[in-house]
Amino acid sequence: MADFSIITVTYNSENTLKRAMESVINQTYAPKEYFIIDGGSKDNTVDIALSYKAIAEKNGIMLSVLSEHDNGIYDAMNKGISMCGGDIIGMINSDDYYETDALKLVNESYEKDHFDVLYGDLRMCYEDGRSFIKKARNRKYMTSRDWNHPTMFVRREIYKDNKYKTETIHDDYDLVLRLKKQGAKFSVLNK
């Protein structure tokens, strides 16, 4: 069974953070640790994050909150990655949420496939209640439409040598392409 480290990068996220955090803390397969990496929010984001510390600990999750200036989302992600001790690292944006059994399904896939990188389908929800499923695909020649960043889980050893670049808004896609080129084992969870 794998230990999970989950990272949420925030900046002025007081309106969306609660749902994201609750979706992590209430997993049927709890993560080992959960990091909130905040870019120096001016609203109540940090207070909201800290208010979940006791609940997280009750569920066996070590919650850490770091708030300081960063150089954008990928810099913040790299900070979080450097703090992680779990076998598998997941990133969930402050305006996204996991289904209750997400980590259980990822762990089952890891036990079966021993992936380096896993990603899955993504339910896109609109404020008016409409939603659709963006299917994930694993092809030899990937496009940015084949994978869904909020559903991506990566073995910590892979991230150690492959940080996000912090130069453009497409640095997540750059990372996926670099990992593909290096021969990382990709797996898709279509659920």
Task: Go through each PLM region and give its residues.
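N-proximal low-complexity "stem/linker" segments adjacent to membrane-targeting elements
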Residues: 1-26
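Cell-envelope/extracellular polymer assembly enzymes that use nucleotide-activated donors
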Residues: 2-5, 33, 174
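A conserved acidic beta->alpha catalytic loop
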Residues: 30, 38-48, 93-96
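Short beta-strand/loop segment that forms part of the nucleotide-sugar
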Residues: 32-40, 64-68
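Glycine-rich, basic loop-to-helix element that forms the pyrophosphate-binding segment
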Residues: 66-84
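Short aromatic/hydrophobic "clamp" motif used to bind/position activated sugar donors
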Residues: 89
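Conserved donor NDP-sugar-binding/catalytic core segment of glycosyltransferases
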Residues: 97, 101-132
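Conserved nucleotide-sugar donor-binding catalytic segment
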Residues: 137-191
